Every structure is written in C-alpha cells, then in structure tokens.
Amino acid sequence: MTATLERRESASLWARFCTWITMNENRLYIGWFGVVMIPTLLTATSVFIIACFAAPPVDIDGIREPVAGSLLYGNNIISGAIIPSSAAIGIHFYPIWEAASLDEWLYNGGPYQLIVLHFLLGVCCYIGREWEFSYRLGMRPWISVAFTAPVVAASAVFLVYPIGQGSFSDGMPLGISGTFNFMLVFQAEHNILMHPLHQLGVAGVFGGSLFSAMHGSLVTSSLIRETTENESANNGYKFGQEEETYNIVAAHGYFGRLIFQYASFNNSRSLHFFLGLWPVVGIWFTSMSVSTMAFNLNGFNFNQSVVDSQGRVINTWADILNRANLGMEVMHERNAHNFPLDLASNESLPLALVAPAING
C-alpha cells in the first residue's frame, strides 16, 4: 500500500482575512459592513472629542461674527457644542483640501461636516452589519429594520434638513444646548407642534414608553416560580432556556380585567411585534415630518381663525403658539436679521405722499 503525502496549500492572506471578517465565533462580529463602519465611526468620534475640547470659533451665520463652542473657549458641558458649518459654505461639500488652510477650514466649521457625514455613513453600515450578522445566524431581519428608526431621524436633522434649507449652518449643533436651540428655532420657523406627522411621532415615542413599561411590569409580576419561598425567583432560570419564564395567560387575564378584554395580547409573537412596531413607525413619522418641513411644508396655521359675529378675533391656543413663535424668531440669529420678516408682514404705510417742493 502506497501512501501519498501532499503539502496542503496554505490559504492566501486575502482568504484568511475574508474568513476572519465573516466568522460568527468572533467576540465581536465585524462583517463586511463593519469594515466601513469601524473607521468611519472612529473618525467621527475622534474628531468630535477633539473639537469639543479645542475647536476655534465658527462663523456660523457667515457675517464674520464667529461663535465659540469648545471647552477651551469658555463653554461647559451644557453650553458646549460642535458649531455647524458656515452659511458661507452652504451645502457645498467642504473637506479639508477644499480650504486654503487648516485655519480657514476650522473657521468655516469644517469639523461639523466631517463628523456628521462620517457618523451617518457609519450608522448606515451598522444597519447593514446587523442584517449581515442576522443572516449568517439564520435569524430574521427585523433587528436591522428597527434600527432604521434612529438612523433616519439622525439623517433628517443632520442631512435632509440642511439640504432643504440650503445650508449646513441650519443643521442641528452637536451639543446639549445646541439641540434645544435647534428645537426652538425649528418650532419658530416651521410650527412643528402643529404638524400631523410630528404628532404621530409623539404618539409613537410616548406610546412606546408606556407599552414598554406596561409589558415589563406585567412580565416581572407574572414570573413562574422555580424556587422555594426562601430563595430568589431569579435563581430559577437559565439563559436561553426553552421553558417560558413568565405566565402570559396570567398576564393577559390580569390586563384584560384591568382595562377590557381586547386591550391585551394572548399571543407572545404578536405582542412583541407590536411593541417593536409602534415606536419604530412613530419615529419614522417624525423623520418624515422634519424632512417635509426641510422644504418648508410646515405645520398647520390656524392663527386668528376663530371670530365672533362682529368679526372680532377669539384667541385660541394657535394664536398663543404664534406669538411664542414670533418671540423665538426675534431672539435667534439676532445679529443676522435686523427685523424679522414675520413682524414686517403687514401692509406698509406711506410716509410721504408728495415730494416736497424746493424753492431755490
């Protein structure tokens, strides 16, 4: 009997890299989307941290009055922010090599574009990575679908809204007080509180919080005890066990009697699908509202729409909201606008009807 020994061909470096990238047994799954996700998110995070501490003031309004947002320039954690790119740049792509110098790039708010664009690309790849990992494990794709909600919300305020308004200077600043400033100005300019898509989004977020609290409390209140009275109920379960840990029939019966029968689910799959669907669809609606208002399809305006038989205005909540909007409009960008257009919308009064005669 003759035995033939052949040298096993070693896999190429590329083949080993492909195997390692797509291996399910890694402590952290990388995947092909992760190849793009990791460097983009690391870049966005690194530039964000550096800019938070040391970025120089940015001429956000394009009127040569720079606004400081970093900690080294007198801000704290609450007031600090990454200031959006200058209105002088508009929606032009503004990488470092487009500026004459690094100082000019910083003065015009280049770090904001760098952070936002890398961040959005990174989180989109995170969606793809979730789908890829689920596919390789034989799971269904709903985890990646659910994560589209925060991604489209971020895309709406960081990308779609600036494009619709014509400048990255209208994007949301990357900071706590900057976020609140963005919300107030958005309300003043677009009346978002009266936009039906935003109202659906509020119902989705608050409803999702309510349903999550209700579900969690019902589950923890109807655990199937596997231990004695002298031992914690938490000790009777194993991670990944096949047996149910709580009695859904008991939870369904309790909640059905607490409200009414059809207000509760008796099917675990439909229950959890609803819990995932409600907030995700709500955030989708909110993102759509911001995206439509980016192109000035604003919220409803019912100002002075209720009058009595004499034609006198009966002030409603819409009129109060309008006055608040005007106040916020006056306060923001006070150096860029001498007189808000909203307050100058009435008919102009003639100051001189006839030119004076000059007798020389």
UniProtKB/Swiss-Prot annotation:
InterPro entries reported in the protein's UniProt record: D1/D2, Photo_II_D1/D2_sf, Photo_RC_L/M, Photo_RC_L/M_CS, PSII_D1
A GO cellular component entry from the record: photosystem II
SUPFAM superfamilies documented for this protein: Bacterial photosystem II reaction centre, L and M subunits
Cofactor binding: number and manner: The D1/D2 heterodimer binds P680, chlorophylls that are the primary electron donor of PSII, and subsequent electron acceptors. It shares a non-heme iron and each subunit binds pheophytin, quinone, additional chlorophylls, carotenoids and lipids. D1 provides most of the ligands for the Mn4-Ca-O5 cluster of the oxygen-evolving complex (OEC). There is also a Cl(-1) ion associated with D1 and D2, which is required for oxygen evolution. The PSII complex binds additional chlorophylls, carotenoids and specific lipids.
Post-translational modification (record): Tyr-161 forms a radical intermediate that is referred to as redox-active TyrZ, YZ or Y-Z.
Enzyme nomenclature, EC number: 1.10.3.9
Gene Ontology MF annotations: chlorophyll binding; electron transporter, transferring electrons within the cyclic electron transport pathway of photosynthesis activity; iron ion binding; oxidoreductase activity, acting on diphenols and related substances as donors, oxygen as acceptor
Site (Cleavage): 344-345
Site feature Stabilizes free radical intermediate, where: 190
Membrane topology: Multi-pass membrane protein
Function of the protein: Photosystem II (PSII) is a light-driven water:plastoquinone oxidoreductase that uses light energy to abstract electrons from H(2)O, generating O(2) and a proton gradient subsequently used for ATP formation. It consists of a core antenna complex that captures photons, and an electron transfer chain that converts photonic excitation into a charge separation. The D1/D2 (PsbA/PsbD) reaction center heterodimer binds P680, the primary electron donor of PSII as well as several subsequent electron acceptors.
Similarity comment: family membership: Belongs to the reaction center PufL/M/PsbA/D family.
NCBIfam families: psbA
Protein name: Photosystem II protein D1
